[in-house]
UniProtKB/Swiss-Prot annotation:
Pfam families: cEGF, PA, VSR_TRX. The chain crosses the membrane at residues 565-585. The gene is VSR7. Keywords: Calcium, Disulfide bond, EGF-like domain, Glycoprotein, Golgi apparatus, Membrane, Protein transport, Repeat, Signal, Transmembrane, Transmembrane helix, Transport. GO terms for molecular function: calcium ion binding. This is Vacuolar-sorting receptor 7. It comes from Arabidopsis thaliana. Disulfide bonds join 418-436, 425-445, 447-463, 471-491, 478-499, 501-512, 542-555. Glycans are attached at residues 292, 400, 432. Residues 586-625 are cytoplasmic.
Length: 625
């Protein structure tokens, strides 16, 4: 009965997917890398290759190796039983024919034979397609998770050229380049993971959950630092209208058949139902939304890992109560999350899940999301196994040059190209300044900013400081020298650039030499003048006991100078005496004038003795009428 139910479930899903395919035109985008033929010269060319969806592509890096085509077992469908070694000390890139077995099995046999990468040549003329890993089967068990080398599909004509060149004995050297496989427009990477809360879907589900647990630490560091913007997504289907009231639809869907997921155990009679998965997927979406609103989007990683360990299907704990206990333990507002989830029984659209269905459809350069798990970085689908370090490298490849966080420049992820020959960039070994900037995809030769001073130049052969404080940095690249306690410099803070020899020196500013003014007879030309050159200047003197006047370029007598000083002193003394006499005279006259004025004023109010004697008659005089 379980088998019958499983087939019924599969039939239902196929019908639903068929309806969806009729509604929207599905689009699958092939993610590519660059392949360059470096040697021999007559074969030099550039081609595209399709990145396989297994193994570990070297995102942000490149690989240079020699092409080897096997004498037998050219399809790689069985073990080679030997190790391929090129004639030259380079990594082996094994060329294999398409057909006969899984692509991943070819890569596995190539890896066992010592290959660093594998090229699979198409056997028909057609556009490139993506080599995917096989579904769960006995053939796939044991090697899919062990594949570490990158695999690339190339078109038939390019494969024919490589095959013929190798058979003619040519040493074919190619470069596999993944540095531009991930768009890197700015300093923030936006990535999304299409996943599922179901942990009973076999190897695919285990791979997803293992990745989430292992990548959690990296993801939260990047998110907390503001370097990335992560968004989780969940695939949902809808039930065809004619099946809405069927038992299958009711057990696998919510909101009256609008959002569905397959039965976890493929058994409609017992265990968990598809709608349980849809509801938990919705809850995890709402956890991210609510956490993002509180500026803690990284809490989603905590919730998903905690839910898997505490509420797994395998332990029969996959329930709403268990989920809400995890939410409470993470101090998330449970009422907001419930409001976000809404009523799963209502005959209405759920905007969160509706958005997910729309997002499944490809936009721009991104193809439709059709398989789980799918990782999208800067709107480009990641190819390869979901492995912590490999995914981190792909995310790091999405940063613009020089904007990568420190976690991306770890020696375990990339090679610091500035350590060898300074990356071919300009450097000032004396000041320990370099134009080489290590980046995840390589290096940049770019003049630096040191202590607030901007250097300008091409970054390869020259960099010179620019701006007001440029002279503090190695004297602005200009000439400078010190002798006998004197320092002269060709750098001036009053100008933003350039070098100019100071007065007393001549040259281009990078080198300056003392000018011998005495030899050039440009100074000390007066009669009786003597010139003595010095570093950065000169000294003029006069013969005898005369003094040299620099402004007039002349010599004067010292005694004449003393007479002038005595004459000046005498004149000043006379002026001082005259001033003193005037002051004394002025003071005397002013006092006499004041005495007279005071007496006049007082006489008006009280008669003075002399005036009284005239006005009072004498006693001897007779009185007359």
């Amino acid at each position: 009965m379980g088998l019958v139910n499983g087939r019924a479930s599969l039939t239902f899903l196929l019908a639903a997917l068929t309806i969806i395919a009729m509604v929207v035109e599905a689009r699958f985008v092939v993610e590519k890398e660059s392949i360059s033929v470096l040697n021999p010269e007559e074969m030099r060319s550039k081609h595209d290759g399709s990145i396989a969806n297994f193994g570990l592509p070297d995102y942000g890096g490149f690989l240079i190796g020699s092409v080897v085509y096997p004498d037998s077992k050219t399809d790689g469908c069985s073990a080679f039983g030997k190790t391929f070694k090129p004639k030259f000390p380079r990594p082996t890139i094994l060329l294999l024919d398409r057909g006969g077995c899984y692509f991943a099995l070819k890569a596995w046999h190539a890896q066992q034979a010592g290959a660093a990468a594998v090229l699979v040549a198409d056997n028909v003329d057609e556009p490139l397609l993506t080599m995917d890993s096989p579904e769960e089967s006995k053939d796939a068990d044991g090697f899919i998770e062990k594949l570490t080398i990158p695999s690339v599909l190339i078109d038939k004509s390019f494969g024919d050229d490589l095959r013929q060149g190798f058979q003619k004995g040519k040493n074919i050297v190619i470069k596999l380049d993944w540095r531009e496989s991930v768009p890197h427009p700015d300093k923030r990477v936006e990535y999304e993971l299409w996943t599922n809360s179901n942990d009973e879907c076999g190897a695919r589900c285990d791979e997803q959950m293992d990745f989430v647990k292992n990548f959690k630490g990296h993801a939260q560091i990047l998110e907390k630092g503001g370097y990335t913007a992560f968004t989780p997504h969940y695939i949902t289907w809808f039930c065809p209208f004619q099946f809405i009231n069927s038992p299958h639809c009711k057990s696998q869907c919510i909101n009256h058949g609008r959002y569905c997921a397959p039965d976890p155990e493929d058994n409609f009679r017992e265990g968990y139902e598809g709608k349980d998965v849809v509801l938990e997927n919705l809850r995890q979406l709402c956890v991210h939304r609510v956490a993002n609103e509180s500026s803690r989007p990284w809490v989603w990683w905590d919730y998903v890992t905690d839910f898997h360990s505490r509420c797994s299907m395998k332990e029969k704990k996959y329930s709403i109560d268990c989920a809400e206990s995890v939410i409470k333990s993470l101090n998330l507002p449970i009422e907001k999350i419930k409001k976000c989830i809404g009523d799963p029984e209502a005959d209405t659209e759920n905007q969160v899940l509706r958005t997910e269905q729309v997002s499944q459809i490809g936009r721009g350069n991104r193809g439709d999301v059709t398989i789980l798990p799918t990782l999208v970085i800067n709107n480009a689908q990641y190819r390869g196994r979901l492995e912590r370090t490999a995914v981190l490298k792909a995310i790091c490849a999405g940063f613009n040059e020089t904007s990568e966080p420190a976690i991306c420049l770890n020696t375990g992820l990339e090679t610091n190209e500035c350590l060898e020959n300074n990356g071919g960039c300009w450097q000032d070994t004396k000041a320990n300044i370099t134009a080489c900037q290590d980046t995840f995809r390589g290096r940049l030769c770019e003049c630096p900013v040191v202590k607030g001073v901007q250097y300008k130049g091409d970054g390869y052969t020259s960099c010179t400081p620019y701006g007001p404080a440029r002279c503090t940095m190695n004297n602005g690249g200009c000439w400078s020298d010190t002798r006998n306690g004197l320092t002269f410099s060709a750098c001036s803070d009053s100008v933003s650039t350039g070098c100019k020899c100071p007065e007393g020196f001549q040259g281009d500013g990078l080198t300056c030499e003392d000018i011998n003014e005495c030899k050039e007879r440009s100074v000390c030309q007066c009669s009786g003048c003597r010139c003595k050159n010095s570093w950065g200047g000169y000294k003029c003197s006069c013969s005898g006991d005369r003094l040299y006047i620099n402004d007039q370029d002349t010599c004067i007598e010292r005694y004449g100078s003393k007479t002038a000083w005595w004459l000046t002193f005498l004149i000043l003394a006379i002026v001082a005496v005259a001033g003193l006499a005037g002051y004394i005279f002025y003071k005397y006259r002013f006092r006499s004038y004041m005495d007279s004025e005071i007496m006049t004023i007082m006489s008006q109010y009280m008669p003075l003795e002399s005036q009284r004697a005239r006005e009072v008659p004498s006693e001897a005089e007779p009185f007359t009428l």
